[in-house]
Each structure stands twice: as C-alpha cells, then as structure tokens.
Amino acid sequence: MSKNSEFINLSFLLDHEKEMILGVLKRDEYLKKVEDKRIRKLKNELLEAKRRSGKTHQEANRVCVHCQKSLGLIFDRGAPCQACSLRVCSECRVTGLDGSWKCTVCAKVAQLRIISGEWFLEEKAKRFKQVNVLGTDVVRQSILRRSPGSEEIQNQEQAHQGADKSDTLSSVRQKATHDGPKRKGFLLSKFRSATRGEIKTPKAESGRSYSLDLDNQNLQSFKSVSGSDRGSTTSSDLTDQEAGRGAPKGSCSNGGIPVTQRSPAPSARSVTSISSREHGFENSMALATIESISEELTKSHRRNTSGTPSIAVSGTSLSSERSRSELDLSESFAEDLEDTSSIRSRSVPGALDKDLNSLEDTEDGVDLVSSRFSANTHSLASGLSTSSQAGSDRKRSYLHVPDADSDTTSLNSMMSVYSETGDYGNVKVTGEILLHISYCYKTGGLYIFVKNCRNLAIGDEKKQRTDAYVKSYLLPDKTRNNKRKTKIRTGTNPEFNETLKYTISHTQLETRTLQLSVWHYDRFGRNSFLGEVEIAFDSWNFENPCDEWFVLQPKVELAPDISLQYKGELTIVLRYIPPEENLIFPVEQPQGKKIFKKGKKKESPAISGGILEVFIKEAKNLTAVKAGGTSDSFVKGYLLPDDNKATKHKTAVVKKSVNPQWNHVFIFSGLYPQDIQNACLELTIWDKEAFSSNIFLGGVRLNSGSGISHGKAVDWMDSRGEEQRLWQKMADNPGTSVEGVLMLRSSMAKCRL
C-alpha cells in the first residue's frame, strides 16, 4: 500500500466513538491470539503424529503406518487411505460427512488447512496483489493519528502553561516542517563524526523526568510531534532522568507506585512467576524513537513480488570455491575426523546436543574483554552493547541489523559459538533482578529493559568482589545469534539500565521463553553463574508493561525436547532414474569456471549409474530472523556419505520472505539401486547473512532409517515418519516423481527414538 492510502480520514468521529472502536479492535486482537494458539496446537499435534508414524514399509505393508498395529491376511487387513494411499487400520481412520474416510494424519492436515485459513490466503494471493497491512491496523492507525488542526489547538493550550515547553515543541514542529530535507544530511554528518568519537553526548536538562505510558495513543502522538527528528535522540539523553530508578524492595518508583515483585512458580527448567503489575514506562520516550525509526526501515525494505517462477538446475560438478560469507561458522571449527559426517555435521546445529565443556566461559570472557577495549578505542568490537547511562560511547557492529538498533540494543557477540555447556561454579544463588518488558506490534521489537539487580551473591570469595553482567536467550534457540549481553557492573547491587532487543513476530514470540541469567565475570578463570529466571511468553500480557522484580533461581539441568518444535514446512519432489533409463547428458561447469585451451576439444565422460533429481519447490512458515519479520533463505543439500564441498548444492537466495519459492533442481549422479538403502539426502535451510555467519532455519533428512550405511553405524541414518516414507516411496517407484511436504527439524542432531 502506498503511504497516502494507509490512513483513513476519521476526524469526524467523537472521542467516545473512537474509544468504542478501539475496544472492538482490542477484542479482535485478543481473539486472533487465541486462534493462533489453537492453530499452533494443531500444528504440534500434526507434527507429533507424523513423527510417531515410524517405519512405513515393514513386512510388505502388513502394519498400520500410524499406530504400527499388525494387520491380518484375511480379517482386519486394513485399507489404503484415499488421500495418501498408505495402509492404515480401522482405528486410524476419520470418516467424513459424505461417508468417505481419511487417515488421522490426512484428516489433521485438512482440518489445519481449513482452520488456519490457508486455503483462503492462497486464493486471495491468486486474485489480488500481496497486501502487508490488515484492515484493522489501518483503522487503528487512522484513529490514533493526530490531525494538523488538533495539534495546533494543543499547541495553543500548552503555550499558556509554560514558555519553555511550548518553545521546545514549536521548535521541533518547525524543524519537521521546514528542515526535513536537511535532516538526512545532518544525521549522516553526525554519524560520521560519531564514528571518530567527536560527538559528546548531552545531558538532560535540570534532571527532568519524562514518563510516557506505552499506550498506543500516547505513542502515536509522540511520533507526530517528533517525526522528523527521529534518530537524533540518543539513548543517553534519558540517563540522568533514569538515575536512581532501581528502587529497592519496599520503595516506590514511577511517581509513587510501588514496584511489585514476581515470585517465580515451578517450571520445566527453572521457575517463572505470577504477580501484579504497575503501569507506566519510564524509558518509553527512547523506545518510541526506536519504534519510529524501525518503522521507516521496515517500509523501505518491503519486497516487490516477482512474476512467473523460474527453475534453476545445479549439477554435481559445482565448484567448491565459495566466498567466505557463504561458509558456515562451524566450518572454521572443523576437525580432522574420519567419520563421514565431519564437515557436514558441523555445518548444522547438531552440536547443540553435545558437550562443549568450557567453550561458553571462554567466549564470554573474550566478548567482555573486547567490549571494554572498544569503549576506550572506539573500535568496531565484537559484542555491541550500548548502555542508556550518560556518557556511554556508541559502538557499532557490522552485524545485519537496522541502524536504529545501534543506539538502544545489546547485540550478540561475533566470537560466540554455543552457550550454557560449561561449569557453572558453586556460588549459592541469591538476589533479584528488575526488568521492564515491552513489545511493539508494528515493528516486531521485543524490548527487555534490564534496570538493576539486588542482593547478588559474591562471585569471587577471595577478593570479595562481584563483576556481574546479564545474558539472555529466547529459548529454545541458544545459538550465538540469539544471545544478548549487558556490560559488566561491579557490586552486589549493580545498575545496568540497558535495553536488550529482539526482532520477532508476535506469533513466534508466543512459542518462546525468555531466559535471563546473571554471571560473574572472571578475567583469568571461569565465569560463575549467579542465577537465572525464565519467562514464558505464551500468556504474557504486553498491553500494560511495568517494572517487575524476578527472584533469581539456580540452574536446572534438563535436556530440552526440541524434536517437536515447529520450524516450518518444506515441499520437495523426488525422482530416481535407474541406470538403464539414464539419458541425461553430463552437466556443464558453471560459468566463470571454464578453462579455454587450444587444441582438440575433449569429450566429457558420460554419467554412469542412476540419477537422483531433487526438486526444491517451496517452504512455508520459516522462522523470521530479520527486521520486519522476514528471512533471506536458501537451501543447501548433500547426498551422504559424500559430504565434499564439490558435491554440495545450493539454491538461489530468496530475500525478505518466510514463504520462499525456489523451484530449483538438485541432480546427484552415480547412484545405483543398491546405494539407495545406504545413502541419505540431507537438506538444510539457512538465512543468508552479509557480514556474519548464516543462520540455521531448519532441515530434513531422507533415508531408510536403518542407522547403518555400508555396514557401519552412523548417526545420520535416522529418518522416521514422513521423511522415511517419502524416501522409500521414491525407491519403490523408479522413474516416477513423488512429492511430499516435510516438517523441518529444529536441530540436525540424531533423532531420539
């Protein structure tokens, strides 16, 4: 939609009419959340049913593919499903109104398609262009938008209240009206001088305290006043106002309202909380500025839909020379192992389930040392953590995040690998942490404002010293790209006043759990664990954010069950061409890799063996990792046990979409019929990052599921359910294309049976 058509003229409505409409929109938003939870529950049930299917071709199809019940020869023989043609018993059937029946899995798929409205969205996409703005959002924005006339009236009223405030607001509006074109050049020059360390952060005038509720009306009115001055407000402008806000237990904040305490309730890993909330957000002025900047960046990065899809083919002779930005982070940690899963197994997060011992403590120490060094030298250090205290220096990183985030967020360290695997120390956990959690629905920004801690344990008993910092993850993702950290603060009652930001859609956020842990930094030894708190967002109320105390809990070691985490779906088409039907010519070298020599041209050798064609069609509901709720995704494929880079296949990168369509063909040659039972097709989906390592989004493995390849036990022959069924169906029908929709794994570690 164009910028002009995003608002409707609703100035004729009265105030109470606007409130009634906003109330209806609020109820509509609540019902959408309830519906999203129900759809997510159905998806998890469907995923669990497919995982539970097990082996589908045992004893010549004489078992039910879903419940594994043995079928008889005469009685209780079972029948093939009319949708998927798999033989199921009488108990695994669902009868429709017209008398026809489907298996339980196909019935759940059809039910999910109807309830989620996927069929309607597909038909809508065929008839209309892609529309990113909902009608309810347009109405809400139109109501909350201030007209120029109302602004002038308010200016006159405020002029009688105080000369200082009216002068400030009028100057801001004057800049918004006349100096708009000059603002871009001013910000550019300010950024250049900031990188040289020439700008000194101004302090707030006379310690004034600005309190602004994170309500939509106040937030939008703040945007209309300071719309052109976005980006020029630094996070340190509010620091003097925020000094002394971390009130201890029993004291008051936010103008006399007592800060309530959350006592965590038992949970699976550690304990989270129930409480009463207070209203008001002291730091929402800075967040409003961030939100307005992120809004502009989101609009400027919208993707134009392309026309008809094209099909690309990659052969087995693709060059192994890749740019460093395409290589995965874990390839730099490759070891000389004789196992067939050497490089390939470390290119996916299967290592999340392995013991990495003291790697976490080491990388935490390196990150924090580099952040201290960068504060003095203005260098582009690894971890970017910008405090809201006065006088703190800005540090920028080359990570792929919007520029607006650099003033208010703590980004992950570039030197991190994986977390939470080492020794946690033997410090007795005590104390509490004060947090303010808010979410911006427009930009998809989750803001965790870490204020302070109190009554922490002593980290170093010998020196009687505590150097604390806070680290956060959005579970179950504990990769380095999902980590945020604060700066180090000294004492058992440290003041942080830092904002940790995540960009994530609200639907995805409801499936995540925030883990905040406090650590003692030891420069010459191991970092010590001081406590943690976990906050589940499935029922969190973001409408009225407030300051809350959380009691720190000890570490609880539980192996997370990540096999049922929904990461999206991948649609592929497989076809195996046996050697006797192979009429495909040798695949040419890619352009740019040809070597021209004088003399007689040599003929390319013919392809021996069979051909495996893998048509990568599309993916749906991928995890959004970029600002605006999108991803730049591509698919990478191996035919194990051959994991050489020369045989690696890649699709093109589809930008700014969580439902990409690749229409790309992978061709693997030299595959004989007897090799099918020993081979494994591994497909992984990655988010392309320009200046850092690619981010894993999910993957699948297709094989016989025997656990053995060429007489050796391997961990990658672990297919179950739909993955195993599709591979076996391809082997049983050579020359025929078979299509399947596969649930993506959240980790490429060996599947637990």
From Swiss-Prot:
All copies of domain RabBD, residue ranges: 7-123
Source species taxonomy: Eukaryota, Metazoa, Chordata, Craniata, Vertebrata
Recorded topology in the membrane: Peripheral membrane protein
Location of the region described as Disordered in the Swiss-Prot/TrEMBL record: 145-188, 221-283, 298-359
Protein's recorded name: Synaptotagmin-like protein 5
Record function comment: May act as Rab effector protein and play a role in vesicle trafficking. Binds phospholipids.
Alphabetic keyword roster: Membrane, Metal-binding, Phosphoprotein, Repeat, Zinc, Zinc-finger
Record flagged with keyword Membrane: yes
